[in-house]
Every structure is written in C-alpha cells, then in structure tokens.
Amino acid sequence: MPIKSFASRLALSLAICGTAMGQKVNGADYNKPDGGPPAKFFQASSSIPVAAIQAAAAKASKVPSHATYPIGQGSTKSTIHSDWAGFSEGAAFSFIADMDVDCDGLNHGCKGNPDGQKETNWGALSAYEVPFIVIPQEFLDANKGTLKGNAVAAVICNGKMFYGIFGDSNGDSPQVTGEASWLMARTCFPKEDLNGNKGHTAADVTYIVFTGDKAVLPSSALNKNYITNFDTLRSMGDSLVGALAKNLNLGGGGGNPPTTLTTTSIPEPTGGSGSCSWPGHCAGATCSSNDDCSDDLTCQNGKCASDGSAETCSWEGHCKGATCSSNDDCSDELACISGICSVDNGVETCEWEGHCEGASCSSHDDCDGNLACKNGKCSA
C-alpha cells in the first residue's frame, strides 16, 4: 500500500488503542491460568502487514553460528536466521518453529510442568501474565552483544501477530527452539488447551526477536514478575515492526511504511471504478475480516466487496467479521458468535473482562454475572 495509507492506518490505530485502552495494570490481578491479560493488550496493530512479514521470514537464509536446533526430542530442526540483524532500525533475528509452553518463573508449577524452575533469566516472570518467548542458551551466549534480556519480540501465529518479550532461555539437553510462555501459547492457540506438557506441534509459528538496547522494554513498563504497561509494549512493537517492514520494502507499490509514527488522517477513497489505495486488498481479494479490505470495502463471504451500509468501528482489527474467542475480543457492541465478531441485538453487558461469554473456564466462578461454565466455556 502507498506509504501515506500505511502511515495513516497505523497511526490512527495506535491513537485509538493508546487513548481508549490505557493498559497500565497490576500484574498480580492477571496472574491466573485462565484469567491472564486479553489478547487485545498485546496484539499488533491491524495495519501491520503480518502476512507479508511472515512470508519474508520464510525466505530468510543467512545462518549465524550456533543457530540450528531441534524443535523437540528427536524432531526436525529449526534455524535462527540473521538476514535482518544488520538493519539500523528494526534489526532482528527470526526463526520458524512449533510452540511449547514455558512456565518457568512465578508459575513454575503450572499444569503439566512438575519440574519447572522458580526463576527466568532476568527475574521470575509470570507465565500467566507475561507474553514471553524463549531462546536457546547457546545462541544467547553467542550473541550477547546484540540479544538483550526483556527485548521486544513479535510472534506470528494463526495469522495474527502478538508482541511479547525475550524473557527466558532454554538450557535443556538438547536445547530446542519454539517455546513461549503459558499466556502467549494459549493466546496463539486458544482451542488447543496447551499446557506445560502439551504444545502446539506444527512448525508454523514465526518468531522475531529485536536486537539492541533500544528494543528492551523499559523498567517503567516491567518489573521482575509482570508487565505493568501494555501500552508501552504495543507502541514499541508497532514501531519496531514498522521499521522492519520498511527495511523489507513491504509497504506496497507506492512506498514503504514509516519508522516514526505520527497522527495523520486516513485519506478518502479515490473513487472511480476499480480504484483502490491498498493493492492486494481490493474488491475480490480474499479476506477473513473487514480489516483485510481496502478503503470502504467490507469482507463478505470471504471476499472484499462494496457495501454502502458499512458500519463504523472504534477498535480496528476487532470489527464485524474479525475472529474472536469471547465478546471482549470484539469492538463496540459486537458480540463473539461462533468465533466471529457479529451484531447481536440481544447482547448483554459484561462487567468482568476476560470472563465473558465464550471465555475459557473451569467452574461457574470463572464466569461473569449469570453466565455458567459449560464444556470449558462461559455460556448463557
């Protein structure tokens, strides 16, 4: 897409999220296996070209030393690539692997993890509250000059991008790649009931860990146990990924995405038959939600199409047609119906965020108001 369009979409999305959500939190409130921070706290802006970045990572080929590891006992191997490590902004290592669950730290006794360790590399993080990833210790030792503890990381899973931090290392024998905290793993794959002894086995997850001191989440947003300001995590993540996208020339035919984020207006559609400001997302393109479509197009039956009655939406990426696991994943008055954000005139309000209809539960006490726990989900 043209640079102005990318900048406008990204800037507006950040402005909406930053002012409307304000995720400064008391981490202990979310230190629960089924009550961690909701996905919206650490999901990338919908303006980030997630699919294009994932495709670029799949083409990476530069292999540094100490970079190849199995993804499990006796399994295939994954290689950490350094194609992006030399950029002046948005520098990062990347790799593709599966996703096992790491509960080291505060929650070392999580389900399926009887032998967890009480500490993580730079503290004792809560695996229930902090979305973090794990890197093999040998690779960390070989790259201590660039890989920093608590550096921002991005994970692409199930077609979505989530931000976290590089919070722990793997010193097992053999050392493996493809490991993330309880929160990150269960956010990526909410229907798989992942735990310390059950991981996502397909090697289809893209991991990106940013390098250098400027990529480290500051102490104002993090303590030894919890992330305390998710706004900072999201803002840094979008900025770093925006810089990476620019370096990879992923802005589309008209230019590159910006490295600095400023508030600008979304340009009006150019009008006319066949006009479209976001190449690849025009009428007829495949889509999963309205946010996959350019300008005023909407996602109808999996295809971007014109719809003069398109509704407004204050939370980009969570509009009508977006995938969801609970009502809290949907904007405004939309409800999560059969995994899709949809209009429901009978939607009831929910006062306990993360415990609304569709949320995971183990008992009725995990559900808001008059909802009940049925088959592991809060239901009316």
Swiss-Prot record:
E.C. numbers: 3.2.1.132
GO molecular function: chitosanase activity
Record keywords, A-Z: Carbohydrate metabolism, Glycosidase, Hydrolase, Polysaccharide degradation, Repeat, Secreted, Signal
Enzyme class, spelled out: hydrolase
Principal location: secreted
Cellular component aspect of the GO annotation: extracellular region
Reaction(s) catalysed by this chain's protein: Endohydrolysis of beta-(1->4)-linkages between D-glucosamine residues in a partly acetylated chitosan
Domain of life: Eukaryota
GO terms (BP aspect): polysaccharide catabolic process
Start-end of each R repeat: 276-304, 311-341, 348-378
Subcellular location as annotated: Secreted
Notes concerning its domains: The C-terminal R3 domain contains 3 tandem repeats required for the binding to insoluble chitosan.
Family label: Belongs to the glycosyl hydrolase 75 family.
Protein name: Endo-chitosanase C
Protein source organism: Aspergillus oryzae
Annotated gene: csnC
